[in-house]
């Protein structure tokens, strides 16, 4: 019974995430979404207990425990999460910031701007880095894009800056005391995904061969990126693994679709179907690893590991479709038409995530435009 409930919860969460990622309606503030998350935690707790008692796969235990901790940290930490902005001018100390709703947020310290600096590439036009030198409670700190400073329980992030005629810096201040719980959950999810990759294949050699094929497909998409003049937000150690994992995931999903279609015309349909299933599961793990890299990067860049951005939402929808496909009853997964349907849905969501999100209404305020 609980397995059917878990599938319904995943589907409901998926649909609400798709709505937010398409129209920008804040479904994550809806009490129904919170109720679904609480029920998912209960379902995960039961699954973890059953998996330990029945000695099921380690990958499953790690993944379900990780997801439980991510939801726990997000729900329990929401009342204590502070996200505010402040404008600081040279020589002028401020002790309060403002939330997204315009409410005043008192700060436990005073902060002022000593110097703002913009660095450019050799062309003199493309920005390379933005840096603010700050004075906080009499001590000097420096914050720049992807390199926040920390003081008094707050992460201080470079958010914006003034025009050429007026020097000031806009900082984002984030207080997130429950993030360590979320981070542990993300690490367990990553461990479960990596462990699962080995289970999908008979040997590391087979996995490596598939990986090389996927890399060849992924390189085609990576070739269009200009690495020479990356904007400050993209100048991060997480950029390459984040993009590479997604390219591998997308390539694996494309290969899963190709093999699933070919299985209908092959005299070795069972082998082709098994290969398609393995590729589909591999894509699911790689999508999760790509999202985790993106989440840690987002925390480093703008202070929030998940912002319900349009691109984030549709990346999650793609992953949730693969999760829903792998959580179907065995008799459904054995039907080639059902398996093909989920592969097609996930592939379509993947295409929308990669190419079509910028055309959606929710993308107007997207952080992934890097303007």
For the regions a protein language model found, what residue spans apply to each?
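Solvent-exposed, non-transmembrane regions of integral membrane proteins
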Residues: 1-371
């Amino acid at each position: 019974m609980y397995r059917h409930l878990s599938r319904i919860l995943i589907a409901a969460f998926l649909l609400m995430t798709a709505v937010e990622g398409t129209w920008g309606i804040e479904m994550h503030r809806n009490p129904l979404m919170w109720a679904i998350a609480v029920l998912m935690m209960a379902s995960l707790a039961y699954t973890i207990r059953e998996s330990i008692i029945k000695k099921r796969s380690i990958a499953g235990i790690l993944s379900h425990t990780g997801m439980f901790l991510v939801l726990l940290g997000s729900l329990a930490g929401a009342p204590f999460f502070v996200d505010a902005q402040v404008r600081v001018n040279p020589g002028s100390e401020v002790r309060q910031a403002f939330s997204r709703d315009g409410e005043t947020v008192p700060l436990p310290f005073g902060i002022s701007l000593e110097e703002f600096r913009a660095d450019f590439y050799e062309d003199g036009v493309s920005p390379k880095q933005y840096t603010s030198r700050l004075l906080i409670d009499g001590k000097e700190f420096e914050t720049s894009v992807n390199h926040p400073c920390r003081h008094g329980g707050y992460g201080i992030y470079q958010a914006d800056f003034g025009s050429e005629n007026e020097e000031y810096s806009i900082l984002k201040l984030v207080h997130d005391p429950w993030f360590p719980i979320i981070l542990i959950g993300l690490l367990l999810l990553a461990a479960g995904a990596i462990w699962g990759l080995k289970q999908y294949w008979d040997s590391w050699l087979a996995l490596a061969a598939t990986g090389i094929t996927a890399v060849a497909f992924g390189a085609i998409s990576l070739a269009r990126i200009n690495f020479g003049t990356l904007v400050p937000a993209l100048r991060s150690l997480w950029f390459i693994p984040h993009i590479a994992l997604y390219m591998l995931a997308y390539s694996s999903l494309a290969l899963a679709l190709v093999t699933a279609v070919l299985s209908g015309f092959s005299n070795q349909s069972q082998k082709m179907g098994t290969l398609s299933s393995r590729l589909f599961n591999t894509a699911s793990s790689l999508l999760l690893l790509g999202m985790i890299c993106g989440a840690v990067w987002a925390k480093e860049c703008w202070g929030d590991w998940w912002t319900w951005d349009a691109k984030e939402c549709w990346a999650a929808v793609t992953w949730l479709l693969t999760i829903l496909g792998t959580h179907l009853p065995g008799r459904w997964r054995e039907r080639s038409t059902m398996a093909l349907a989920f592969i097609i849905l996930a592939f379509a969501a993947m295409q929308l995530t990669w190419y079509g999100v910028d055309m959606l209404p929710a993308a107007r305020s997207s952080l992934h435009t890097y303007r």
